[in-house]
Amino acid sequence: MKSTLVKIYLMLSILIILGMNLQAQMFRVRIKDQLHTENFDGRLLLLFSNNNDSEPRFQVSDALNTQVVFGKNVDHWIKGTTQTIAEEAYGFPKERLSQLPAGDYYVQVVLHKYETFHLKNGKTVKLPMDRGEGQHWNLAPGNIYSTPIKIHYDPKNADLVELNIDQIIPPIPAPVDSKYIKHIKIQSKLLTEFWGRPMYLGAHILLPEGFDTHPNVKYPLAIFHGHFPADFSGFRTIPPDPNLKPDTVARFKIAGYNRIQQEEAYQFYKKWTGPNFPRVLAIEIQHATPYYDDSYAVNSANMGPYGDAITYELIPEIEKQFRGIGEGWARFTYGGSTGGWEALAVQVFYPKEYNGAYAACPDPIDFNHYTTINIYEDQNAYYAKSDFKELARPGLRNYLGHVSSTIKETNQKELALGNNARSGDQYDVWEAVFSPMGEDGYPKRIFDKHTGAIDKSVAAYWKENYDLTHIIKRDWPKIGDQLKGKIHLYVGDMDNFYLNNAVYTAEDMLKQLQNPSCNCEVDYGDRAEHCWNGDHTQPNYISRLRYHQMFIHKWAKEVKTRAPKGVDLTSWLY
């Protein structure tokens, strides 16, 4: 009897201790009256940092030195009321507040605001509308946040920490037209209909030298795909600023990279305006969505007909306003990473509308290699498993193969920033682009965000609609004549995100294509990281700044082999 009572006492003691730990210290958040202008929906983020190098909201990443974030949804936050962040908030890299070690931290809260969309199909969703920043929760104008304070945090402490939201992120000024760079913004009829509210597309246009003095010339269109551009990048009409304070880029281990960028931008200006540079219109597109900083330039169940809107609404309007040739043979695409995937995808899905795709380090173009996951054969995205072993799948490496993040960790970070694919980050946007829409109006998960279990029905949908390697092979009898000679792929064999793996199997498939043969180009950079683009003569940190001059020249030399007979191949080469 005595022994039994002792056991019961010990069990109760353990449960009490566990219960105390599961409570953790709580945070109560209120909004300054002047900022609480309406009832808010959104994601409330609580951020911790053990240093004061920058605000905590700028220190969350996939890197080993990431700081900490916890998130919870807020629905209809009424003015004058408070929100409590406690143990149920989901976090990264610690999942729960009770797991965060006691210590001194700089603490901050951010409210990432959501808006309500009534979709064409009758679904209603709450999402963060892009506000000119390119879908960054820590930079989005209108988001509100607290001034960081230093506290001593102890998960065993029952004291309530008060946090006051007293700051708002200001609007971002619109870019200004100049002699060479112009800007355009249109309301898309297709996207407005899908989203149930006005939706816009924009672009930055770099005009060729002599545009005004050659009023009768019409120009080819060079389309640089990539992440959200605040303005046309890498073009500078004045020499580098001699007083510019040099920065340090840890990735490249280079001091003064900002000076290198300015010098490269100035050199590009001199080449662009000098003799022997092909005279084309070069554009960078703004197509941020409520899910990400761009749409991936294709039609999607969750994001709408961005492919059609860009190809049939935006591009013709640009060509109309700025004297583009306006025919598929005179358009080509290039880009890296997300832009690399987009460059290839639009060429495949619109084979007659574009005449060349130069895709560097593309996002996964074969879902047998969805980074380090095979969505068709693997059962779990986070772990390779056997009867006696479980191995975490790597997600981020350097050129030596040293791993700094796993697939699970990256997705844990995304889930802390937002559920229902609302983090504005990488794996979430792939689901927003590639997945069917769920019954709740949000993208269906390719894998469970908590466990990593892969949904094979979603994988089958991905394969038939967005696996570019599979689609090219499947549709080659129909589109081969329109694609031959147009596909160019480049990737480093030590890409940080393992994107080279998909290119390997894509290359194997392309080599086997017949009637016609592909006549494609695939090239690899030895020990090159993300995002190597085909230049064997320069280090990655230089070549990544030279997309325009590299691929505009390359296309201008190749176009004569793919252009229809009788078209104008000379007037724009003045």
Predicted regions and their residues:
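Short, charged low-complexity linear motifs
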Residues: 13, 31-34, 292-298
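Non-catalytic cap/lid and distal C-terminal segments of serine-dependent acyl enzymes
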Residues: 50-52, 58-574
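Contiguous beta-strand segments within globular domains
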Residues: 25-31, 37-44, 198-204, 223
